[in-house]
């Protein structure tokens, strides 16, 4: 029998770059892998935000020079095959040098050459798709991956290697108490409805411009918490002037503690990025999603449908955000019992153990 103490720890190379939507889930999995005794390294791009996010995470970074080719100019497309080959060779060199046992791709330009390198070297591949519509790189890698993880059901065609895991989320979010208890407690205390508006780190201009008047026009007792981004802070604050006396408003550039914000909210109005939808479900909050209209393949609408189709959320397309439509949408939602029922449905469709599920799958490679 093999002595477990003599078994070499699995070396897993993470592949995620470009946006927080790719990097944060990969980082959650990477930290969990380390806790399980795995060696972890990270394949990154030279200018990607992953370098900053990984700075103090005790994960060695290996960079390959690669950029996206989708929708770019003719010259870049002509050069793309050569850049991909060069990046693939660099990735192969790192993987051989580090004796990588498995790779885990979470999206971004780096995952293409990294996945190709692993395929050539015979290293097993796991991919994870955060959105309800698969990105280009993951669509290609799904053909050769050993495990295909999806956050939302039926993102990929049915196969033995497809697993619906959900998106990894922060522990502070999974620790939030049940929605029924939270909503009932606020109702028993006679609190006005708490409306949370989240535009993301840069703020969402459409939400900042159109929601203040829509909420003022409801003329109901409300506590409004509006995160608008730094650049639009003053403009958004001014839009709430002359709010009804029964409406309390806090406008802020950023929210430091999103777990607390979710915990206190009766209704959240926000974009429908993959991690946002996942966090809303995990926290258990009723939602109105306003999908980003320029999102590739309209994937934010597909993300939002995951909760809208089960009665846990409403979808409001940005192009329809007229005063009349917003009034018709919001008025029926100003009912805590209804919002509580939506929040409970959201929590029922959460997958709070997604991080461990993905880690377990990587361990089987």
Swiss-Prot record:
GO biological process, one term: regulation of cell shape
Enzyme Commission number(s): 2.4.1.227
Membrane-topology annotation of the record: Peripheral membrane protein
Record GO terms (molecular function): UDP-N-acetyl-D-glucosamine:N-acetylmuramoyl-L-alanyl-D-glutamyl-meso-2,6-diaminopimelyl-D-alanyl-D-alanine-diphosphoundecaprenol 4-beta-N-acetylglucosaminlytransferase activity; undecaprenyldiphospho-muramoylpentapeptide beta-N-acetylglucosaminyltransferase activity
List of residues binding UDP-N-acetyl-alpha-D-glucosamine: 19-21, 131, 170, 201, 255, 274-279, 300
GO annotations of cellular component type: plasma membrane
Reactions that this protein is recorded to catalyse: di-trans,octa-cis-undecaprenyl diphospho-N-acetyl-alpha-D-muramoyl-L-alanyl-D-glutamyl-meso-2,6-diaminopimeloyl-D-alanyl-D-alanine + UDP-N-acetyl-alpha-D-glucosamine = di-trans,octa-cis-undecaprenyl diphospho-[N-acetyl-alpha-D-glucosaminyl-(1->4)]-N-acetyl-alpha-D-muramoyl-L-alanyl-D-glutamyl-meso-2,6-diaminopimeloyl-D-alanyl-D-alanine + UDP + H(+)
Keywords: Cell cycle, Cell division, Cell inner membrane, Cell membrane, Cell shape, Cell wall biogenesis/degradation, Glycosyltransferase, Membrane, Peptidoglycan synthesis, Transferase
Similarity remark: Belongs to the glycosyltransferase 28 family. MurG subfamily.
Protein task: Cell wall formation. Catalyzes the transfer of a GlcNAc subunit on undecaprenyl-pyrophosphoryl-MurNAc-pentapeptide (lipid intermediate I) to form undecaprenyl-pyrophosphoryl-MurNAc-(pentapeptide)GlcNAc (lipid intermediate II).
This protein's name: UDP-N-acetylglucosamine--N-acetylmuramyl-(pentapeptide) pyrophosphoryl-undecaprenol N-acetylglucosamine transferase
Species: Acinetobacter baylyi (strain ATCC 33305 / BD413 / ADP1)
Species lineage: Bacteria, Pseudomonadati, Pseudomonadota, Gammaproteobacteria, Moraxellales
Gene: murG
């Amino acid at each position: 029998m093999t002595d477990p103490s003599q078994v070499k720890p699995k070396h897993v190379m993470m592949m995620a770059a470009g946006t927080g939507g790719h990097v944060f889930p990969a980082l959650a999995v990477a930290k969990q892998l380390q806790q399980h005794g795995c060696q972890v390294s990270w394949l990154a791009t030279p200018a990607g935000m992953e370098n900053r996010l990984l700075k103090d995470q005790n994960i060695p970074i290996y960079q390959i020079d690669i950029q996206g080719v989708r929708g770019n100019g003719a010259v870049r497309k002509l050069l793309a095959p050569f850049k991909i080959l060069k990046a693939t060779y660099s990735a192969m060199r790192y993987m051989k040098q580090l004796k990588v046992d498995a790779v885990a791709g979470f999206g971004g330009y780096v995952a293409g050459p990294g996945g190709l390198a692993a395929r050539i070297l015979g290293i097993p591949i796991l991919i994870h798709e955060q959105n309800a519509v698969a990105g280009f790189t993951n669509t290609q890698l799904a053909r050769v991956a050993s495990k295909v993880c999806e956050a939302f059901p039926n993102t990929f065609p049915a196969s033995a290697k497809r697993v619906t895991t959900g998106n990894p989320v922060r522990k502070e979010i999974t620790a939030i108490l049940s929605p029924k208890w939270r909503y009932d407690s606020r109702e028993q205390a006679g609190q006005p409805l708490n409306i949370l508006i989240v535009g993301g780190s840069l703020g969402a201009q459409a939400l900042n411009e159109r929601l203040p008047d829509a909420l003022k026009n409801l003329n109901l007792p409300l506590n409004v918490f509006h995160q608008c981004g730094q650049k639009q802070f003053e403009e958004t604050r001014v839009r709430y002037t002359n709010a009804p006396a029964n409406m309390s408003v806090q406008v802020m550039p950023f929210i430091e503690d999103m777990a607390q914000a979710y915990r206190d909210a009766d209704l959240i109005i926000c974009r429908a990025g993959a991690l946002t939808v996942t966090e809303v479900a995990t926290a258990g909050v009723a939602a109105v999603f306003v999908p980003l209209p320029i999102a590739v393949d309209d994937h934010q609408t597909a993300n939002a449908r995951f909760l809208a189709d089960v009665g846990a959320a409403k979808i409001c397309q940005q192009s329809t955000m007229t005063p009349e439509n917003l009034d018709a949408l919001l008025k029926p939602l100003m009912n805590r019992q209804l919002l509580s029922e939506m929040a409970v449905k959201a929590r029922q469709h959460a997958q709070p153990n997604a991080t461990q599920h993905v880690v377990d799958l990587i361990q089987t490679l």
